Amino acid sequence: MSVTAIVDYGVGNLFSLASSVRAVGGEPVVTGDPKVLEAVDRILLPGVGAFGDAADKLRATGLVPVLDGQVRSGKPLMGICLGMQLLFESSSEYGRHDGLGWLHGRVESLAEALRGTADEGLKVPHMGWNSLTYADASCPLLAGVPEGSFVYFVHSFYAVDCEDSLRAWAPYGVRVPALVSRENVYGCQFHPEKSGSVGLKILESFLRL
């Protein structure tokens, strides 16, 4: 399946993700080297923690122009969890922070969205297994994955105003965008590497792009 880069910028469980890539027949390389990112066939952008901190760390590596160039060249890239959130234009987590802007939309507090609603009692972070409802079943990452399949989430913020890239969502008081895409850019709010056979199937489909 050729080589998949996992971007190392000091954020995320990189080796768990690498193990999952290997499990579906891929060849992972964990790297922060621009030359490697330019040479591989596709890129995974992981991430955990706060948006602003992750965005600052990614920019400090000097990799953003490299990643932008690879996206513009048509190379498939997928953000995972916070890595997906970084694909959008901005986040309001602990102040306003600019994202990479490859997808339209912004990232907002899930707790704020639930406040004053009948679902205010739902726990935040949204942590655990939840089902997928399809907004666009033609997305190649959903091939062979039945609607209603469960995947694993851990997050306190979520994407909004992203209807043009929404492919699947999960119910949690609001419609939580779970899988987004635009051209060669993809994002999973859930962790495919923690989502059992369904997550591995989605990861395998990305590796076949």
What are these regions (language model features)?
Residues 1-5:
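Extreme N-terminal starter segment of soluble prokaryotic enzymes
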Residues 17:
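Divalent-cation-assisted or electrostatically stabilized phosphate/pyrophosphate-binding catalytic cores
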Residues 27, 42, 76-78, 150:
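Structural signature of beta-strand start/N-cap positions in the alpha/beta core
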Residues 28-39:
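Short acidic low-complexity segments
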Residues 39-40, 73:
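Alpha-helix C-terminal capping/helix-to-coil transition sites in glycosyltransferase folds
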Residues 44-46:
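Structural motif
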Residues 49-126:
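Cysteine-nucleophile active-site neighborhood
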Residues 72, 106-209:
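Amide-donor transfer/coupling interface in amidating biosynthetic enzymes
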